[in-house]
Amino acid sequence: MKFIKYFFGLTFLLPAFLLAQTKATISIENKSNLDFKEAVVSVKWDAIISKFPQIDTSAFVVINDKTKKQIPFQLEHRGLKAIQNLLLQVDVKANTSLSVTVQKGKPEKVIVKTYGRYVPERKDDFAWENDIIAFRAYGKALEKTKEDAYGLDVWVKRTTKMVINDRYKKGDYHIDHGDGMDYYHVGFSLGAGNMAPYINDTIRYSGNYNQWKVLDNGPLRITFQLMFDTWNAGGIKVKAAKTISLDAGSQFNRIENVYSFDGDKPMPVVVGIIKRPEAGIVSLNEKQGMMAYWEPTHLEHGTTGIGVLLTSPVSTMMVSEKQILAKTIVKSNEPIVYYTGAAWDKAGKIANSKQWNSYLENFQKQTQTPLIINLK
């Protein structure tokens, strides 16, 4: 009799146990007063596996429990063979939560919204983009040429399509063919938010990057690394590695720099924005670590806004004739994280300095109060 009772007990428990192995429910909570729109959130893959150990990475879907529609996702590897995170693009209104379920199914094709690559055919450029904006960094082949530049470049766009390959193929990306162009001038500056050592009141530029590695390449997030040869930064031998991420739907890159140099003493660094000779609008907030620059309008091409958000304490901000700078410090082999990005008025989303400053403020608040992820 005891055996029969035990057997029936297992029979009732078995369906619930099996059900728990065939799905994972994720709660995404927004405790802020701001709406998160098209936000890319990260869920630890190990946590998914713990709830859904039999998941087939080629045959699962993520379902919005309210609308029953599929949610776009990406398996993030961070340069490793094993999956590290599940990335989801979601909308979560202020002070609400969203429930989604990971379950077996045939996933819909996700629209590519981020992309980047090494561009050997254009003197070692590395270019990357999302569905809003595009950027590039300069490589070794450009050094000691009349085109040489040190900072980050911006390519403006007014299309959600990926444009990098088409623009390089045409070779005339300084002309607007209807979807944007490259009219941003970098020259011998930090451009659109690059970082460099600042020794004895002088920016100590590195050479251009000499190695690159793509860690993830869309469809929702691109992450890559740029490595720089050792250089003499005002008497300090410095080596640098920069890890850059750009999410779909965002105006901003996340940049994590690691500087290697001798000694325990912190090294001063600056993040900079090139300043135009004509009148633009500069907005600085040292306490918040925020720099915004609404450039003067560039002929018929429109107006570009550049912004920087630092996560480390800023000792001072400076406006010179040629650059806008924010000064902070780094320790050897310890990562420093900041955000830099751009907007274009002709893209139709951000039309003036007031809107650009508001975007920066809201973006910073969202990084400080991110969406909260829980698995059930």
Regions found by a protein language model. Give the residues of each.
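Solvent-exposed beta-strand/loop surfaces of large extracellular or lumenal domains
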Residues: 55-83, 232, 279-295, 304-316
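Extended acidic/polar, glycine-enriched regions
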Residues: 80-121, 269-281, 287, 291-295, ...
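Beta-strand-rich recognition/accessory modules
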Residues: 85-87, 308-376
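Solvent-exposed N-terminal domain segments of exported/luminal and surface proteins
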Residues: 106-203
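Extended, loop-rich substrate-binding clefts of extracytoplasmic carbohydrate-active enzymes
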Residues: 170-248
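Acidic (Asp/Glu-rich), glycine- and aromatic
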Residues: 240, 251-284
